[in-house]
Amino acid sequence: MGLPGVIPALVLRGQLLLSVLWLLGPQTSRGLVITPPGPEFVLNISSTFVLTCSGSAPVMWEQMSQVPWQEAAMNQDGTFSSVLTLTNVTGGDTGEYFCVYNNSLGPELSERKRIYIFVPDPTMGFLPMDSEDLFIFVTDVTETTIPCRVTDPQLEVTLHEKKVDIPLHVPYDHQRGFTGTFEDKTYICKTTIGDREVDSDTYYVYSLQVSSINVSVNAVQTVVRQGESITIRCIVMGNDVVNFQWTYPRMKSGRLVEPVTDYLFGVPSRIGSILHIPTAELSDSGTYTCNVSVSVNDHGDEKAINISVIENGYVRLLETLGDVEIAELHRSRTLRVVFEAYPMPSVLWLKDNRTLGDSGAGELVLSTRNMSETRYVSELILVRVKVSEAGYYTMRAFHEDDEVQLSFKLQVNVPVRVLELSESHPANGEQTIRCRGRGMPQPNVTWSTCRDLKRCPRKLSPTPLGNSSKEESQLETNVTFWEEDQEYEVVSTLRLRHVDQPLSVRCMLQNSMGGDSQEVTVVPHSLPFKVVVISAILALVVLTVISLIILIMLWQKKPRYEIRWKVIESVSSDGHEYIYVDPVQLPYDSTWELPRDQLVLGRTLGSGAFGQVVEATAHGLSHSQATMKVAVKMLKSTARSSEKQALMSELKIMSHLGPHLNVVNLLGACTKGGPIYIITEYCRYGDLVDYLHRNKHTFLQRHSNKHCPPSAELYSNALPVGFSLPSHLNLTGESDGGYMDMSKDESIDYVPMLDMKGDIKYADIESPSYMAPYDNYVPSAPERTYRATLINDSPVLSYTDLVGFSYQVANGMDFLASKNCVHRDLAARNVLICEGKLVKICDFGLARDIMRDSNYISKGSTFLPLKWMAPESIFNSLYTTLSDVWSFGILLWEIFTLGGTPYPELPMNDQFYNAIKRGYRMAQPAHASDEIYEIMQKCWEEKFETRPPFSQLVLLLERLLGEGYKKKYQQVDEEFLRSDHPAILRSQARFPGIHSLRSPLDTSSVLYTAVQPNESDNDYIIPLPDPKPDVADEGLPEGSPSLASSTLNEVNTSSTISCDSPLELQEEPQQAEPEAQLEQPQDSGCPGPLAEAEDSFL
């Protein structure tokens, strides 16, 4: 088939003639029609085929990018046709043919018809391809087509990667080829013609990373004046290779502008095309379009912008203000004018023809800003408007081409206020009331009256007054405008002809800003005397009510007695939030109840702000002793109900904890028929601080010899040779020690016992039947009739005693920690000394005047021992057994300073709190060894989780004591558990199945969580599981003292043990002499041992 490159002139002239005829002839709406019809045809090789396409306008045939040979004609019915004749066809004629309207000769019609022709050619399996079509570029993961087109639609075609025989499963279309998603590889198509395999050309697929096109178009100015320049930028982000094409108004006149390409390297990269017209003309107004395309995938985008070229600049108002603008006094007011202008104008604000400027004090603010390219807003902000700012304002906006101005009046509205309301009594008997007020706008005056003075302001509407026809009242009003103040003043005078009873008259002024009123009571000329009396009574009542309120507030702020001991119920997962047992909800066991007639109160051992501790004699507490000296805790008669509840809570906690050798044990209680009494053990030598102060001289005298180190100290039951007691040291039972009187006030009001029991009176307590072992050093002491086991019966205070005190306190606190009990006030003042230097932990804050005690600091309605408290307790109110460990470290410092006051160098103010936060710790005491001070430092760790538990402190202190001391302590502890001590007996009555054997505590465990309840011990607050006897026996190391616990022995003995009575054994075999006397070394500077050698604590 011949496809000439140039159409002959005759044919061209025919087409022009047909076009003219079409323009002059009738129009039809008929579409394109191909004859013969069909989507595809299969032709025999070397055959001839004719296709005719007709339409309502000149039409033509297209094959791909070529124009095949065709003949155009105009039919008689007014339609146009084109005949395509294919002669001697070959396989190369296979392809698609399009019939389209000839756009260059007719209207722009976009309709087109397609037909596909196959010419099977055995010599040509695949259609030949141009070399550029063998390279296929794809972007991202989009589908593409490998154009393996064949001449015969009956052939089966497969796609392979080159050099791989396995075909790929990709959809195939005989007219298009394989369509799918391909990787960056080389592909080949295969088919079979007869018995011959035919391969296509090799296709190369390449993936290109082409990001999406992001086009932005902006102009320096979209509005320009004639003669100014136009500059438009078209910017593409993130693409490296793009094509720019501009469309602009000058193109119509053939005046082209060469754009400039600008490369801006960076992340991301930018490419820009700049279209610049240096001198704008009015004809340059219009739309400027920037079309950007990517040559790889023909993807593109375009943006347009409108440019207006004006002959001259302009200024036009868009939003104006009214002729009168209102501002309210002392409120900010913004006056805003919106206008449109080009170029940007200058703006001035004037008040009363004087130019305004920004106020340095911020009272006036001027601003003009762009809302858009040619739209502006100018604002005048008056901050807290004043009356002087009222007046006439003008806003001027101008430039060299145009000017506009706006004028208005600013009125400042002032709230109305009554300045004066006065009453006068002229001589003619009239009542004259004058009301003067001011405001802007002009206020209106309203007078009203009410005769029921009690109900008038609340329930009755006043009756309006005015000029009465009966001439009972006359009203006169004058209005004046003050130009300087820019407000109106109203003066209204009301004249009442006759007033026969008290009358309430109200003057009310009102305007748009609100109203104000005042009232005056008009009375007859003779004022009744009862008004004066009533006023005085009311004033007195008000003063009385205020005084009562003040007294109630002071009473509520008065400190209350609070129990310091708390029992932990549960702990949060992070270990920083604790829930404590509410002791109010605990039951009280009546087995602890002691009849009041079996208790005889004696002298006061200590008294405080909330209560007192009294020495007493109890009858019938034990089987072996008819009477027993005890200590009784009680509240004052003025105690509040909350304080009584606190004391009852303390009783419940003590009754549930159980007995222990180093805790002041509960012996009984009186809760019925009178005030609450808590009966505890009596410790004759008072608290540890007072004990250390009283015996400090014996310690210092013993260690005054510098050649006698503490390690040479021996455990002795007798005085060293050559050591004599000072003459002023009295060791009798009644005067040696005793409770430290913690209150200087001896006149304590006791609750009369006669009110409860008529046959019981206060009596002096007789001296106990037992005498202190110290008495054997006093010539007048009677002969002792028995021998008791004591930890230490030496009257001399030794270093071993200090370590022993620390060891015993640690044992007692370990017992409380095992019960989840937090002490919260562990200090030397709350540790008592008993016979044989046995120490017991207590809480006698009830008997201490904490409001005058410098050791307690007021915080809210309570007093806190801040010097003994851990940082988490001071700053976060967190109390745990490990915060008690911190307090134990302070107690060690007290012991080894012989009763010193902690932090002597720090005042109790912000300096103390800042020092604790910075990690300040007290220095090593003079009498403390390095081992003791190391224990103190462990107790003072900043993070409470790293402090050692009391079980570990017991072991650390136990290592510093000799075997003799530990054995005697263990012996005393065992005798205590086997005795008929009242605490033991009553606990056995409540828990008959509890074994006396104590299981050693696991030193690695710290009490963080509450122990789960056990059914067999359901009376305990937080019960512990029953230990197995055989396991406990095996776990107890030989020679080590048993740790504290509340378990009891079922075996009762006939003897009774008291804190101050020597421990008597059931059957004590004949004892030999305690220890052989050791010879005193000659010429020794150190006192020699006289009895059993004291084990070194080092």
Curated annotation (Swiss-Prot):
Changing Y578F: Strongly reduced levels of vascular smooth muscle cells and pericytes in developing blood vessels. Residues 1016-1098 are annotated as: Disordered. It comes from the Eukaryota. The modification Phosphotyrosine is found at residues 561, 578, 580, 685, 715, 739, 750, 762, 770, 774, 777, 856, 933, 969, 1008, 1020. Autophosphorylated on tyrosine residues upon ligand binding. Autophosphorylation occurs in trans, i.e. one subunit of the dimeric receptor phosphorylates tyrosine residues on the other subunit. Phosphorylation at Tyr-578, and to a lesser degree, Tyr-580 is important for interaction with SRC. Phosphorylation at Tyr-715 is important for interaction with GRB2. Phosphorylation at Tyr-739 and Tyr-750 is important for interaction with PIK3R1. Phosphorylation at Tyr-750 is important for interaction with NCK1. Phosphorylation at Tyr-770 and Tyr-856 is important for interaction with RASA1/GAP. Disulfide bonds join C53-C99, C148-C189, C234-C290, C435-C507. It catalyses: L-tyrosyl-[protein] + ATP = O-phospho-L-tyrosyl-[protein] + ADP + H(+). One of its GO terms (cellular component) is cytoplasmic vesicle. Disruption phenotype: No apparent phenotype up to 16 dpc. Lethality late during gestation or at birth, due to widespread bleedings. This is due to a severe shortage of vascular smooth muscle cells and pericytes, especially in the central nervous system, skin, lung and heart. Mutants suffer from hemorrhages, anemia, thrombocytopenia, and show defects in the formation of kidney glomeruli, due to a lack of mesangial cells. The keyword Transferase applies. PROSITE patterns: IG_LIKE (PS50835), PROTEIN_KINASE_ATP (PS00107), PROTEIN_KINASE_DOM (PS50011), PROTEIN_KINASE_TYR (PS00109), RECEPTOR_TYR_KIN_III (PS00240). Residues 599-961 form the Protein kinase domain. GO terms for molecular function: ATP binding; kinase activity; platelet-derived growth factor beta-receptor activity; platelet-derived growth factor binding; platelet-derived growth factor receptor activity; protein tyrosine kinase activity; signaling receptor binding. Present in an inactive conformation in the absence of bound ligand. Binding of PDGFB and/or PDGFD leads to dimerization and activation by autophosphorylation on tyrosine residues. Belongs to the protein kinase superfamily. Tyr protein kinase family. CSF-1/PDGF receptor subfamily. This is Platelet-derived growth factor receptor beta.
